[in-house]
């Protein structure tokens, strides 16, 4: 097992979270075979090492205190006598013995190690990419340790950047560093503070420059919404300000326009990407522009309780006011919806307490799904999450109150159901754009299944986390336990991208974990009864 954020000899962890709309077209290519890997697996407080086919490289009957349960190419890291060691695939050669007692998970295949009170960077072959010279080192980006997008290092309370492979991007000049979500979604830019001044750093080019804002609020259509304190403005992809920082609110940039409000009680309108007013403020609410238009709620005399209509880039109304509510089209639990470029979710009230929802295509200016669903959202241009009024429900407790929440399914644009409602409360598109994640509950530590875009089940909902590794052709399944700040994760199964199992664990006998290969053949332990504790003699205990 691995424990998150620990720097000493203790388990360590990382995880992935799902993003949206990474792929718009279904990938029909045949998945690549599993890459060659060395995979430590820990069960029953013992650790064995497998290859990508589930064959055993190192038996579980060994002297290792723990192994780092991270798949590497041809090595693995284990602890013994309070020190971390790097070994070859079958453990017959110790490549880097006793190299540290302070290990950090950084980026894939790269690790921080401590020596004489200083940290350096090591690759998975044991090469010291950066010699120990740093007071501090950790992974950077909006991803957990071990899956970082870059590396942050500190010297004398100043911080600098290393690339994902450990090369120097900046000198240690900065007091703080901030990432906007996934840096890949923000052109590689990172915000930094240096001597009370605001800077941006481009991780890809190494460019640094001073800017007049201190926060990225949104990034879309190659433009940023940025802010300084409570005032917002628009910047281009190079972080050049296109407007003054004077707006109370700005929406998400889309198709050359961005919504704005100058003050809290102002009406909203739209700016173009030159910072000029394209549609004068005349609306109570303004949504993101698609290629054809955007949804707006006109100002009314009854306190803004009118309906939404669809307008063109000229401001001309293209539809009559129709919808009681509109919002982002990516479904998420608890109403925390996210933007889907080119789509808007629509809603119509059925009575004071019930609303039905649909999907409007703002690129084409057409209604894709009429408001007939109690929940709906976009996965891809041809796939939608949905729940109908008669869909099965599950009991969900939130803030101590129990209520019934509809279960979700997946259908295509023609209405064909690919995943029936009944089991899942949350369904999202995987970051790769090639897979669908389906969660049985709304919490982080819920069982997660993985499907392909045709609705084929690849990984059953037996474990709490499924990591997609396209480069290796692998799907890794992990069990999660503990609180978010003290979480452990244990590798429990490996599948190919088409859902063929390579190995998995199962519970047998007296709750003993047993590893089996893809054909169901036992790998280890072959004698699970030996891991059962001695039965207690209750009568003898009572007699004493």
Predicted regions located by residue number:
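Residue-level detector of conserved, function-critical positions
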Residues: 25-544
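Bacterial N-terminal signal peptides that target proteins for export
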Residues: 2-12
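C-terminal motif of bacterial Sec signal peptides marking the signal peptidase cleavage site
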Residues: 20-23
């Amino acid at each position: 097992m691995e424990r998150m954020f620990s720097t000493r000899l203790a388990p360590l962890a990382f995880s992935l979270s799902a993003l949206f709309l990474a792929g718009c077209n279904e990938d029909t290519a045949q998945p690549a075979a599993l890459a060659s890997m060395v995979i430590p697996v820990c069960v029953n407080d013992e650790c064995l090492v497998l290859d990508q086919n589930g064959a055993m490289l190192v038996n579980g009957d060994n002297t290792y205190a723990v192994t780092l349960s991270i798949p590497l190419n041809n090595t693995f890291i284990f602890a013994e006598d309070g020190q971390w060691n790097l070994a070859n695939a079958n453990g017959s050669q110790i490549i880097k013995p006793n190299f540290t007692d302070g290990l950090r998970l950084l980026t894939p295949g790269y690790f921080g190690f401590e020596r004489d009170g200083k940290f350096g960077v090591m690759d998975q072959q044991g090469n010291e990419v950066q010699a120990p010279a740093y007071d501090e080192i950790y992974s950077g980006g909006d991803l957990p340790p071990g899956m970082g997008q870059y590396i942050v290092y500190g010297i004398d309370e100043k911080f600098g950047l290393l690339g994902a492979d450990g090369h120097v991007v900046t000198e240690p000049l900065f007091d703080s560093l901030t990432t906007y979500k996934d840096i890949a979604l923000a052109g590689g830019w990172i915000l930094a503070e240096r001597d009370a001044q605001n800077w941006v750093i481009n991780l890809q080019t190494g460019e640094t420059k001073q800017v007049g804002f201190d926060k990225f609020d949104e990034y879309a259509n190659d433009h940023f919404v940025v802010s300084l304190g409570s005032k917002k403005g628009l910047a281009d992809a190079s972080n050049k300000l296109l407007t003054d920082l004077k707006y109370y609110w700005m929406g998400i940039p889309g198709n050359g326009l961005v919504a704005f409000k100058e003050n809290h009680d102002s009406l909203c309108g739209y700016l173009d990407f030159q910072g000029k007013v394209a549609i004068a403020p005349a609306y109570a609410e303004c949504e993101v522009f698609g290629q054809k238009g955007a949804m707006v709620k006109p100002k009314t005399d009854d306190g803004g309780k009118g309906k939404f209509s669809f307008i063109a880039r000229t401001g001309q109304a293209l539809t009559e006011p129709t919808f009681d509510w509109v919002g982002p089209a990516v479904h998420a639990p608890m109403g925390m919806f996210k933007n889907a470029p080119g789509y808007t979710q629509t809603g119509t009230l059925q009575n004071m307490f019930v609303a039905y929802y649909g999907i409007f295509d703002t690129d084409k200016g057409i209604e894709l799904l009429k408001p007939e669903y109690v929940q709906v959202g976009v996965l891809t241009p041809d796939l939608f999450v949905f729940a109908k009024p008669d869909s099965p429900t599950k009991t969900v407790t939130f803030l101590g109150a129990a209520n019934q929440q509809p279960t979700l399914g997946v259908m295509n644009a023609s209405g064909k159901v690919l995943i029936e409602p009944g089991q899942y409360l949350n369904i999202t598109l995987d970051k790769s754009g090639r897979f669908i994640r389906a969660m049985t509950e709304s919490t982080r530590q819920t069982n997660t299944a993985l499907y392909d875009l045709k609705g084929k089940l690849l990984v059953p909902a037996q474990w709490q986390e499924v990591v997609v590794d396209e480069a290796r052709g692998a799907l890794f399944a992990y069990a999660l336990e503990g609180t978010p700040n003290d979480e452990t994760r244990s590798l429990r199964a490996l599948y190919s991208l088409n859902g063929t199992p390579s190995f998995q664990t199962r519970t047998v006998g007296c709750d003993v974990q047993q590893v089996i290969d893809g054909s169901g053949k036992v790998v280890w332990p072959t004698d699970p009864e030996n891991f059962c504790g001695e039965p207690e003699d209750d009568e003898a205990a009572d007699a004493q």
